[in-house]
């Protein structure tokens, strides 16, 4: 189940393991359209990948710190380090490949 992050919880939620960070906004149609896919992929990953959701309207400091300027933005992280970043309208295939990268344990 995706976890909603706040400025207080973001570092802890992303510090260990493979994490798919979803920066989204309530008025971002591409963000909303991709949410069911991301939820399904997390379920398929069986705990190998955690999804952390960041509502950009409520967490501007986190967005600023990570230089997230457009939505949607997806950041692939492992043990607190950024591996890769996808921004703008990305395809379902790109998101599936991101999950495969995180599940496989290899570099992006």
Please state what every model-predicted region is.
Residues 60, 66-75:
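Structural micro-motif
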Residues 54-62:
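Structural microenvironment flanking redox-active thiols in thiol-disulfide oxidoreductases
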Residues 5, 49-51:
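Hydrophobic/aromatic anchor residues within beta-strands of the central parallel beta-sheet
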Residues 20-21, 51, 74:
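Hydrophobic beta-strand anchors of alpha/beta hydrolase catalytic cores
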Residues 30-45:
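Typically the conserved alpha-helix immediately C-terminal to a functionally engaged Cys/Sec
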Residues 1-17, 101-108:
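N-terminal leader/targeting and pre-domain segments
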Residues 14-26:
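Short active-site neighborhood of thiol/selenol oxidoreductases, capturing the structured segment around
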Residues 75-108:
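Non-catalytic, surface beta->alpha helical segment in thiol-disulfide oxidoreductase systems
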């Amino acid at each position: 189940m995706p976890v909603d992050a706040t400025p207080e919880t973001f570092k802890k939620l992303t510090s260990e393991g493979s994490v798919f960070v979803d920066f989204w906004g309530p008025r971002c149609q591409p963000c909303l359209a991709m949410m069911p896919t991301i939820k399904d992929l997390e379920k398929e990953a069986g705990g190998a990948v955690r999804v952390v959701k960041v509502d950009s309207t409520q967490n501007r400091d986190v967005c600023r710190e990570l230089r997230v300027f457009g939505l949607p933005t997806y950041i692939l992280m492992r043990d607190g380090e950024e591996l890769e970043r996808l921004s703008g309208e990305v395809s379902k295939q790109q998101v599936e490949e991101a999950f495969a990268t995180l599940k496989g344990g290899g570099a992006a």
